[in-house]
Amino acid sequence: QYAEAWESLAPFVKIGAMEDDKFADQVSDLILFATTAESIEGEQEPIKAGEKRYTTLSSYQNRLSDPQSKRILYCTDEVAQAGALTLWKSQNAEVIFAETVIDSQFLPWLEATKDQYKFQRVDAELDESLRDEKPEISDQDGETQSETIRNLIKDALNNDKVTIQVQALKGGEDAPPAMILLPEQMRRMNDMGALMDQRLPGLPDHHV
């Protein structure tokens, strides 16, 4: 029942936690996020409520294959970030959803107050687990296919602020043909500036 009511309670709980340290301590293990993880019989989390499944952050981290990892993957827009989300899910990575306006302030607040959390949006970067590292053959001029594609795109865009990377990705047919990567800290600064200026956030000047 608590999970079913969470969407209505979440804004008040999150704002209250950010404004009152004692309240934050009391609710730290009660804060839920929708997750891509499947419910497991006999396990308390993820909790199924309607069409969604919910988890606490501590349970998320307990399910990580690397117990030393602090990284928590999150998605703010299931449609706009669909390619990156699908790619991570294809490698069995769990992703939480932080889609409300308050989450743009709540996640950085959690990082600042809880040393065990480090949040990374699904479209922030591509780590080794997502790359399909295969040796490439060079042509007669010594240029690989990746370098040829990179140069073609770079010439077409003609924008020095955009970094072009050509990489083979895992995921087979589900892998997106192209992605825009927005480095986490740069994007957060851009989003904060947009919030202060009361405008919709756009792409940072520099992106990949």
Locate the predicted segments by residue.
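Conserved GHKL (Bergerat-fold) ATPase module
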Residues: 1-208
